[in-house]
């Protein structure tokens, strides 16, 4: 069994952060989104994994994951370049996959309970393809499933104006190698891409066995700022434990808070769930629930809540920062004048003076 992680796409909805790195490396709870994907695959027993690289900073992806040995897997890199569709990316992996069954996992998707249960359903059901579905409020943003009166899957429609159901395709697919024969016969869609939904539809039309499962628990497509903040809150709420390894001086740490080695908290209040990364400085500040502060960042004389702060950022003299996504090496500094609550999405190396 092999797996493919899709790590391409321009990430336009997460600009300005994606001007300086791929969207899948944006951290939630101080860990890149695509690392949760990698760990999910490994926990399901898969160790032979390909990462599809796009045009957006492929070297940063290689730098983070290396050959996979530090994560307990073997990683092969395959370059797609321009985003020509999921099916195109999958077809590039034909030689890598060989005759084995495989999983395709979008690198910006998160599943609360992981894929292990669904992998077992795919293997035990002897399906040619197996998809995951989740009921959503606005299915027009996704590929959508249509069923017959007996609940059998009959059609998949990509981002329909009039959805046949509210069941969206989750970004995880299970395939036998026969999918490559379908992709070979595809023509580009109206947006110039080879659509994986069209390839799966071809399987259905030609009588192959395509199964599905309704995902239990939450599923997140972390394509926008609010999605990142929501994912951060959910993961902090579920997975963060109280662990104090840094230095605490004249401060209160309330609830489930992780403070990593080398961090210093001075004359401050931290209320969990929250995580403070290595070598951070929190001084004369309040860190509220659902906040992640990545390594090397400094928060001084400020109040921060429900935020994701990337590494080496500085926030100083800000009365209230909330619902914000702050890039690496960014500076948010209050100079003079009236203080007020702020809501920001600030890219890497930015400087904001208030």
Question: What residue spans do the PLM features occupy?
Answer:
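Alpha-helix/helix-capping structural signal
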Residues: 9, 56, 177-178, 226
